[in-house]
């Protein structure tokens, strides 16, 4: 029997400064964070920490 949708989903984070160039993949709990997340991660293109925003 198949179960329903899980609580955790895989999301893609994209750099706001270099859009479409570098992305991270991570999971989030859809109950705790229903809105789009923004995380500060390392961008190897700019060689510094940048804000990465969740995309569809």
Swiss-Prot record:
Would the keyword Ribosomal protein be found if you checked this record's keyword annotation?
yes
PANTHER family, from UniProt?
50S RIBOSOMAL PROTEIN L33, CHLOROPLASTIC, LARGE RIBOSOMAL SUBUNIT PROTEIN BL33C
Task: Cite the InterPro entries for this sequence.
Answer: Ribosomal_bL33, Ribosomal_bL33_CS, Ribosomal_bL33_sf, Ribosomal_zn-bd
One GO cellular component assignment for this chain's record is: ribosome
Q: Which domain of life is it from?
A: Eukaryota
Q: Which GO terms describe its biological process?
A: translation
Identify the keywords attached in UniProt to this record, alphabetized: Chloroplast, Plastid, Ribonucleoprotein, Ribosomal protein
**Which Gene3D superfamilies does the protein's record reference?**
Ribosomal protein L33
The gene it comes from is rpl33
The record's GO molecular-function terms, alphabetically, read: structural constituent of ribosome
Please state where this protein is localized. Answer: Plastid, Chloroplast
UniProt similarity note: Belongs to the bacterial ribosomal protein bL33 family.
Q: Kindly indicate whether the keyword Thylakoid belongs to this entry.
A: no
Designated name of the protein: Large ribosomal subunit protein bL33c
């Amino acid at each position: 029997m198949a179960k329903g949708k899980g609580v955790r989903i895989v999301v893609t984070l994209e750099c706001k400064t270099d859009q479409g160039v570098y992305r991270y993949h991570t999971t989030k709990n859809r109950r705790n964070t229903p809105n789009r997340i923004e995380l500060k991660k390392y961008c190897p293109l700019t060689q510094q920490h940048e804000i990465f925003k969740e995309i569809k």
